[in-house]
Amino acid sequence: MFVRLTLADVKEGEMNNALEYVENTVIPSYDGVPGLLGVAACAANDGRFMAWSTWANEEAKDASIEKFNQALAGAGEMLAGQPVVTEGTMVAGQQYVAVSKDGEEGFFARFVLGGGTQEGKTYDDVADFMTNTVYPAYENVEGIYGTGACKVAEDKGFSFNFWTNHDAAHAASDLSLIHI
């Protein structure tokens, strides 16, 4: 699996327009694209626009990037600068509850964009820790949909988890604050 994460500053008063554009234009334009597993967007807690897409593999993402860029072009006027894109191969993950693509319920997403690993560790060590320690701890936690970790470089990556709501994520925050 391959994940592409985009963060962008949005012009004052344009966040709702940017989110509506993704929901009403970008996401529908991707219906039936081979290898695309999901697309979502939200307003991050730091005020930036955040969108992510998940793909069967990097090749599927690369094959559709032109269509993706065309679909996003209309959002350019709402942005206050050039978006920052981070992408990587998912090296660990766990789905706890299946959610239909037609689901109308919102959800809470938490992304952890790390600056790197501890000295002497690689992101493969992080993936092993997530798989063997964090994910089993989430097994009986209320409100979790799924979680994953993506490798960007040998010693750098990001992780994410999706919850029914902020309260569920906050209630389980002690589980996700374990460090290696």
Features from the language model and the residues they span:
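Short S/T/G/P-rich N-terminal loop/turn motif that feeds into the first structured element of a domain
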Residues: M1-M50, T54-L177
